Swiss-Prot record:
This is Glutathione S-transferase. Its EC number is 2.5.1.18. It comes from Gallus gallus (Chicken). GO terms for cellular component: extracellular space. Glutathione S-transferase that catalyzes the nucleophilic attack of the sulfur atom of glutathione on the electrophilic groups of a wide range of exogenous and endogenous compounds. Involved in the formation of glutathione conjugates of both prostaglandin A2 (PGA2) and prostaglandin J2 (PGJ2). It also catalyzes the isomerization of D5-androstene-3,17-dione (AD) into D4-androstene-3,17-dione and may therefore play an important role in hormone biosynthesis. Residues 85-208 form the GST C-terminal domain. GO terms for molecular function: glutathione transferase activity.
Length: 221
């Protein structure tokens, strides 16, 4: 065993992508064991690796961790991406939970029925422009630092960049009215570990397309 975290999930973004982002931002190398068929998932279930019979699952520090939030909290705490005190952690948690709501909206568009896709995406992009991005523009303005919390990189910054890029895949000019978020995106994208993760050939996964859904359904259903 190499000692690197091992990520068990399908070869897709899904609920593991934020884990990949956070490990990459922390400069932590990790391995991936992809579920390719239903039997791969069944094996993890039957050998007791999945506490609640679900992936994502991450092997780290002798544990087999499940539940995405628990995994992210552990990684953030272990690699000093979770603020310096309880108050900073509370802010980070608030920002991250809000971002998770927006990310979920964007991520779920691909699985909407054909006649609902356009409406669903329009709703998600409207919420990005009018509910979520204005919040983070104001946070950056009021806080007056390069990062959302304190004056160093936290998981909130990592998840904000991940979410911005996901929104821009559907609306490239999504940040047109948000100059501070534009600067934030440019700044954080150039942090060496993140810049490396954004290069072709990294372990970052492409956007889920409709053609990928049957493959995933065969594993998970």
């Amino acid at each position: 065993m190499s000692g690197k975290p091992v990520l068990h999930y399908a070869n897709t973004r899904g609920r593991m992508e934020s884990v990949r982002w956070l490990l990459a931002a922390a400069g932590v190398e990790f391995e991936e064991k992809f579920l390719e068929k239903k039997e791969d998932l069944q094996k993890l279930k039957s050998d007791g690796s999945l506490l609640f019979q679900q992936v994502p699952m991450v092997e780290i520090d002798g544990m087999k961790m499940v539940q995405t939030r628990a995994i992210l909290n552990y990684i953030a705490g272990k690699y000093n991406l979770y603020g310096k005190d309880l108050k900073e952690r509370a802010l980070i948690d608030m920002y991250v939970e809000g971002l998770a709501d927006l990310y979920e909206l964007i991520m779920m568009n691909v699985v909407q029925p054909a006649d609902k896709k356009e409406e669903h995406l329009a709703n998600a992009l409207d919420k990005a422009a009018n509910r979520y991005f204005p919040v983070f523009e104001k946070v950056l303005k009021d806080h007056g630092h390069d990062f959302l919390v304190g004056n160093k990189l936290s998981r909130a910054d990592v998840h904000l960049l991940e979410t911005i890029l996901a929104v821009e895949e559907s609306k490239p000019d999504a940040l047109a009215k948000f100059p501070l978020l534009q600067s934030f995106k440019a700044r954080t994208s150039n942090i060496p570990n993140i810049k490396k993760f954004l290069q072709p050939g990294s372990q970052r996964k492409p956007r889920l397309e409709e053609k990928d859904i049957p493959r995933l359904m065969a594993i998970f259903h």
